[in-house]
Amino acid sequence: MVSSTPEMLQGGVTREQIVPSRKRIKLPAWLEIAKPRLIPLLLATTLGGMALSEGWPLPSLRLACTLGGGALAAAAAGVLNCIWEQDLDGRMQRTSGRALPSGRLSPTAAFIGAISCTLAAAALLVSGVNCLAAGLSLLGLCSYVLLYTAILKPRTPQNIVIGGVAGAIPPLVGAAAASGHVGLSGWWLFSLVMLWTPAHFWALALLLRDDYRAVGIPMLPVIQGPVVTVRAISRYGWATVLLSGFGVWALPEGGLLYGLLLIPFNARLLQMVHQLGAAPENVDRAKGLFRWSIFYMFGICLLLVVSRLPMAANFDLQAWSLLQQMASSGQFI
């Protein structure tokens, strides 16, 4: 029997304060298993992939079909993940109240819902966007359910490093929707999300390592401990910051404005990584980094969209013109 008393973590923080409890934020069972809290960030990176393409901005109907199809595919992946892990969820306090382990929804009904969402996503993307976008969405779904959930997660502490490919596919979907192909800029954002994912997820895993240890999931904090995990977070955090700067060249226009606006985002990310590195056991710092990393990726995608506005292109032209004038007049010497 699972205790109803919130379990305290180091620093006097409960799991319910880290990940909102389903007892406090009650969703309908059919919506809960779709993991709707994860979908907005996936759609944001899809928009980022679109903004990097020459086909931006998209016609309204194609934009709606892309985001709608992506949301349905993400929902299907979330449901299939819940079906696969229902026994595991039932053994962890944090997840024991979810729809499937608690019996509020049957696995059969959930599976029918997942198949329905998958078919609807494929139909919407094929008819309203293109086959490449549809195929990439289905690849992301399969990567999450099969590669990450079924194969990597229960077997290796590097599960999220490789399995992060699933969460990095939406930018490719966006690029395919905008231009019919995936160029280097789309692959840049794919790579950025891949590098961002381990630091983001390991910050959460530090908070929940007791849960993972109890059910035998070999997350990095469970196998290597907080100190090694925080060092890995630092490496991936720095790699994320370095790669994010290449967006200046990945953008068709507006890259200079993107680069300037990126500076405070990267500075804050590195500050929080450094603070966690100084106190690997500090729950508040791990929680802060986890939350900021979400805001960071939303911010990157917003910067990509803003950088495609006409005013961003004008800013770039004026800035480069000013720099050329200063160079020709010898003011840099």
From Swiss-Prot:
GO molecular function terms noted in the UniProt entry: protoheme IX farnesyltransferase activity
GO biological process: heme O biosynthetic process
Catalytic activity entry: heme b + (2E,6E)-farnesyl diphosphate + H2O = Fe(II)-heme o + diphosphate
Coiled coil spans: none
UniProt keyword list: Cell inner membrane, Cell membrane, Heme biosynthesis, Membrane, Transferase, Transmembrane, Transmembrane helix
Group of enzyme by EC: transferase
Transmembrane segments: 63-83, 109-129, 132-152, 160-180, 188-208, 214-234, 245-265, 292-312
EC number(s) per entry: 2.5.1.141
Pathway: Porphyrin-containing compound metabolism; heme O biosynthesis; heme O from protoheme: step 1/1
Subcellular location(s) per record: Cell inner membrane
Keyword Cell division: no
Gene Ontology CC terms: plasma membrane
Membrane topology: Multi-pass membrane protein
Primary location: membrane
Gene3D superfamilies cross-referenced by the UniProt entry: UbiA prenyltransferase
Extra remark beyond the main annotation: Carbon 2 of the heme B porphyrin ring is defined according to the Fischer nomenclature.
Function: Converts heme B (protoheme IX) to heme O by substitution of the vinyl group on carbon 2 of heme B porphyrin ring with a hydroxyethyl farnesyl side group.
Family: Belongs to the UbiA prenyltransferase family. Protoheme IX farnesyltransferase subfamily.
UniProt xrefs under PANTHER family: 4-HYDROXYBENZOATE SOLANESYLTRANSFERASE (PTHR43448:SF7), PROTOHEME IX FARNESYLTRANSFERASE, MITOCHONDRIAL (PTHR43448)
Name of this protein: Protoheme IX farnesyltransferase
Gene that this polypeptide is encoded by: ctaB
